């Protein structure tokens, strides 16, 4: 087994080999991060209410769901690089169309296309990185990928301080950044990976196997989608200025990076469901604090930073919880099914938040999130009473995963997680069986294969 020094050297070597992919992805995230805060600000100037913006954001997440399903078909036909170029070009065009056609129906349609393109890009890059990574470097590579994604998004939102939403300049800047993302990727010397076929894991079967993970994915995706898409709408309806809004929205994204690895490591050492219950309860309390803090108070930015630090890692922990219980041969199919559940929660969030803010005022943003997180904590407490957790030594290793619908559908590529042996190739899936009476106990087949 390689030591820590060899593992670090392998990670650095691999990062240098895929620097073009990370650069292209960073440019794309900065451009889309700017677009994400630009639309609510422009919508406020155009008289588009919180309810209408909620519809637009919900349609955007519907695009994520569709993109995660249709883009792999295009990948099989023409390959990763061509599909990436097509998606980035289409996404760049969509930003400019939003600047010209300022109506709720047109924004909904165009933002649906943007969601489809974003989901496709995530599928491409994550499968590419997983194909290049090894057992020893995968966690570090995906962690670096997550930092680039969150950092790019926060950087794009902060760019809003350079201009205003009432002109074309910021729309053009967003479009240019997304277009530039094509350059390093198309010139990359990295070999495009193949996309393997996946097994089936119906949502009903996954729910019967590990209901806590399915319900948790829906709830935490609701909260994460609200925090990423409706935070700017909360800022505009609360009377914040553009500068304050950019700080408020980017604070949650920055916070998302801070506790991903520490909370994941904690859930590896202790019963995962108990850790998730604690994180959900703390997040609920932070949402209540946010609801009680006046929007004019600068401390609300700090509250949102800590809130993001606890909320966003929940998605990855629920993914790990699902992997604790499903058979090794269904890891990839489970990932796709979790995307479906995640998309349902993500699409419901903007609609619900938009309606509650229009009906009860801006503070309903945090109150709604507090209710959702409180219900999640209560459900986890109930599940703890009816089903014993898996022993800590049999839990799968946590991997940093961003809470974004569409990003995980094919992210594990040809690799799956075995709870005892770690990451291994899908070619070896037939070598492991599951004792259906005890889903947490993985056994060797009786035919003597090894």
Briefly describe each language-model feature range:
Residues 112-147:
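Cytoplasmic helix-loop-helix junction between adjacent transmembrane helices
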Residues 82-96, 175, 274-288, 370:
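Structural signature of the two symmetry-related core transmembrane helices
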């Amino acid at each position: 087994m390689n030591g820590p020094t060899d593992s670090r050297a392998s990670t650095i070597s691999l990062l240098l080999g895929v620097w073009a992919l990370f650069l292209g992805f960073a440019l794309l995230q900065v451009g889309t991060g700017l677009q994400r805060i630009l639309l609510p600000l422009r919508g406020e100037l155009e008289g588009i209410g919180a309810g209408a913006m909620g519809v637009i954001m919900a349609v955007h997440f519907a695009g994520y769901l569709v993109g995660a399903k249709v883009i792999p078909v295009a990948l099989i036909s023409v390959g990763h690089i061509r599909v990436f170029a097509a998606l980035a070009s289409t996404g760049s065009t969509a930003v400019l169309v939003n600047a010209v056609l300022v109506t709720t129906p047109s924004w909904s349609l165009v933002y649906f296309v943007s969601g489809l393109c974003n989901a496709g890009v995530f599928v491409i890059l994550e499968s590419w990185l997983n194909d290049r990574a090894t057992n020893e470097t995968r966690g570090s590579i995906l962690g670096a990928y997550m930092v680039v994604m969150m950092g790019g998004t926060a950087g794009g939102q902060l760019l809003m301080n350079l201009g205003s939403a009432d002109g074309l300049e910021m729309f053009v800047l967003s479009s240019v950044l997304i277009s530039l993302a094509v350059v390093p990727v198309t010139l990359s010397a990295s070999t495009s990976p193949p996309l393997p076929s996946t097994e089936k894991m119906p949502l009903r079967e996954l729910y019967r196997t590990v209901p806590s993970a399915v319900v948790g994915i829906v709830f935490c995706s609701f909260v994460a989608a609200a925090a990423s898409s409706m935070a700017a709408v909360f800022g505009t309806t609360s009377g914040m200025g553009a500068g304050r809004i950019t700080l408020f929205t980017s604070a949650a994204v920055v916070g998302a990076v801070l506790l991903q690895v520490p909370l994941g490591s904690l859930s590896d050492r202790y019963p995962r469901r108990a850790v998730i219950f604690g994180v959900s309860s703390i997040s609920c309390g932070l949402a209540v604090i946010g609801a009680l803090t006046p929007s004019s108070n600068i401390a609300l930015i700090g509250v949102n930073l800590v809130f993001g630090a606890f909320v966003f890692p929940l998605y990855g922990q629920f993914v790990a919880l699902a992997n604790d219980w499903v058979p090794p041969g269904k890891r990839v199919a489970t990932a796709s099914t979790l995307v479906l559940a995640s998309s349902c929660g993500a699409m419901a969030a903007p609609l619900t938040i938009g309606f509650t803010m229009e009906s009860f005022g801006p503070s309903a943003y945090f109150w709604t999130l507090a209710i959702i997180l409180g219900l999640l904590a209560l459900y986890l407490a109930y599940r703890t009473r009816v089903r014993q957790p898996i022993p800590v030594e049999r839990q799968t290793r946590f991997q940093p995963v961003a809470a974004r619908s569409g990003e995980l559908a094919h992210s594990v590529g040809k690799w799956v997680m075995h709870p005892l042996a770690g990451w291994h190739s899908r070619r070896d899936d037939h070598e492991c069986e599951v004792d259906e009476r005890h889903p947490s106990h993985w056994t060797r087949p009786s035919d003597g294969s090894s």
